[in-house]
A protein has these predicted regions:
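Solvent-exposed, low-complexity, repeat-rich "mucin-like" stalks and linkers
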Residues: 1-9, 47, 51-84, 122, ...
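Serine/threonine-rich, repeat-prone extracellular segments and beta-strand-based repeat modules
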Residues: 10-41, 46, 85-121, 160-193, ...
């Protein structure tokens, strides 16, 4: 709003003068042109400064929950002011922290151009389902008489997961020949369970140690000496 007066008498807009503006939207120097009409003639100009608005005056929409990916998550907030959506790189820039692992990530919004200052918004990163991972097949194992606990190779997004950091393992039916099961339970950045099986094959008798049989004395009957068979690998 402007006031125009002459000899302490306030002039009337659109009766004594008209007003036009230039460069009066964005941050910088704007110009008002006052042009006389009626009893007045000529044009005078006045400048005024438009300064940046604080970015905290904007409205930042909620960021949907994100799911762990193994990489940095750069969720984009929707930022509006006065009904208009701001443009990243023109009105603001974004930086992120704590945006890889499960927990609360933060995006810091820094004003640019017509906006100044900083504000921030948080978002949640939830664990990835263990069923989304890839579990490599385990080759057949041979019976040993002991518990057999092979370690599976588990990957997600081309990255190998770490036992006891990303998952834990439990085994069942993993002693005797047959089908054994591994249950994989997510931990940390992973949640839920998945399972896989592997085969335990019979051990060849050729690998057993058979004791020497002492000479037997004729009895006139079928002789069945005791034989000691041992598995030296057990």
């Amino acid at each position: 709003n402007i006031t125009v007066s002459c000899n302490d008498v306030e002039l009337v807009k659109n009766t004594d003068y008209t007003v036009s503006y230039s460069n009066n939207k964005n941050v910088g120097t704007a110009t008002i042109s006052i042009t006389g009409i009626g009893d007045y003639t000529g044009t005078i100009t006045k400048n005024f400064n438009i300064v940046a608005r604080d970015i905290s005056d904007t409205t930042i929409g909620s960021i949907p929950n994100q799911t762990y990916t193994g990489n940095s998550i750069s969720a984009l907030p929707v930022i509006t002011y006065n009904g208009a959506t701001l443009t990243k790189g023109t009105d603001y820039t974004l930086t992120y922290s704590n945006n890889v692992n499960v927990g609360t990530g933060t995006v810091t919004i820094t004003g640019k151009g017509n906006f100044k200052g900083t504000t921030s918004k948080t978002f949640s990163i939830s664990a990835r389902a263990m069923s989304d991972t890839s579990v490599a097949n385990i080759s057949s194992q041979t019976y040993t008489g002991n518990v057999i606990s092979p370690l599976p190779t588990i990957t997600y997004n081309n990255k190998t997961l770490k036992k006891d950091t990303d998952y834990t393992l439990s085994y069942s039916d993993n002693i005797n020949a047959g089908t054994a099961t591994i249950t994989i339970t997510g931990k940390g950045n992973f949640t839920g369970m998945t399972s896989m099986t592997f085969i335990i094959t019979q051990k060849s008798a050729e690998k057993l140690n058979i004791s020497e049989i002492a000479n037997q004395i004729y009895t006139g009957k079928k002789i069945k000496p005791n034989v000691v068979i041992t598995d030296t690998e057990r």
